[in-house]
Amino acid sequence: MTTEEKRNVIVRSALSRERKNKYSQDSDKRTRIESGWGDCSGTVWYWYYKKLGMNIGGNTEAQINKGRRVDVAINNGVPDEKNMRKGDLLFFRGQDNSRTDGVGHVEMYIGDGKIFGHGSGVGGTVKVMSEYCRMRQGQKSTEKLKNKGLICVKRYIEDDELTEVNDIVWELAHRGIVSNSDLWVEKLKEDVNAYWLARKTVKYIREHE
């Protein structure tokens, strides 16, 4: 699949369950999306893993620590969407000071100023991004976190030519950096952090040849 096809399949898959799931944080239910359950992080994890074989992390704490931070201006809690792409994830503060940046919720950008996510009740739901972000910004949190506004936008599907796992592994193997290509292909498909490290390694090598 091309980068655009990957982004579209993630969005289409997520939207296929619009208002069809009950909210649950139960570990036995939260990732059973096609069985009618889910929560915010379980929903986005499920589709990335099922459709692309990418393990972006099963909860917001894991997810915010993976992927690449997108360079977006945030004004009054609302991101400038000109640098955003379908499938990007928006992370919001909750009420737990112990988590990375107090992260407590995640939504998926689906294009045209809209986002999709499963917060509570029946979901997931499509929302106008600017309205939702302003609403979160206005919600109080702990004294340390102040509000439940947007923390950052993260990307897991890149839009340059170096996106295919097979291409990355082939180049690393060709240069004698890794052996057992099949094993590395599987590792990079399952581990987003390993994927990004390998990708950065190849990019660095190319730039310094």
Put a short name on every predicted segment.
Residues 1-61, 85, 93-96, 100-105, ...:
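N-terminal capping segments
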Residues 40-46, 162-209:
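Short, solvent-exposed alpha-helical surface patches in non-cytosolic proteins
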Residues 56-60, 106-136:
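Catalytic Cys-His active-site segments of thiol-dependent hydrolases/isopeptidases
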Residues 105-106, 169:
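Conserved beta-strand and immediately adjacent loop positions that scaffold enzyme active sites
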Residues 141-162:
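Low-complexity, Gly/Ser/Thr/Pro-rich intrinsically disordered linker/tail segments
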